[in-house]
Amino acid sequence: MCIRDSLKELRNRLIICAVVFVVGVVVSLAYADRLIDLLTAMGRDYYQFVSIAPQEKLMQYFRVSILAGVIVTVPVAFYHIYAFAKPGLKKSESFFFKMVMLLGLALFCVGVLFAYKLMMPFMLRFLSTGIEGAEYIQTTTSIESYVNLCLTMFIIFGCVFEMPLITIILSKMGIINPTLLKQVRGVAIVIIFFIAAVVTPPDIVSQCMVAGPMVLLYFISIFLSGIFYKPKSDDDDEDDEEEDDE
């Protein structure tokens, strides 16, 4: 296949992904009320939601619909990336490429579900009722701030749950190994808590709730790296030396 044909195929696949995204956004707008209901269900017992600006409620509908459109488009985009790259891949590479995309999508969904079912309800409850006293203070929040917090946590946990997959890929490529991960685990834990402090509300409980799963996934990644890491064999070294001699 010449470059012109490849570019034409790539353009057609990008157009398909764009059409799927637009359709996903339009359809999601019709169900925006239900999507907002799903998000607010986690904090409805602890917060009273208000719309401060005239356009605030409408903008959240668009924001949630766009995110839903992205979610619908991602599997389609993954398929077209695989289909476009498949002719240039070996059979083993094609299988590994396909498994990486499927596992990556599954892990991201697990991370979002983990945040929605476990982390966010606990975090919202603590932020609302974690401090005793001042019962006369009514807890309210703008719908924009609430949606921003929810979507941020979903994206963070979705990405965090990709850590084992990234470790597997880098270990198979020989870029990292379990020994290296063990040596830098102290620094990694400090970085994890720093990141958690930046992306979470300013309280120690929220920080630990985000950092805890990240630290656990880091140690799981060390274990997986030990399974998938393959050090360079002597045969490969000899082949490299022969190529250098030539």
Give names to the regions the model predicted:
Residues 4-246:
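Membrane topogenic/interface segments and analogous intrinsically disordered interaction regions
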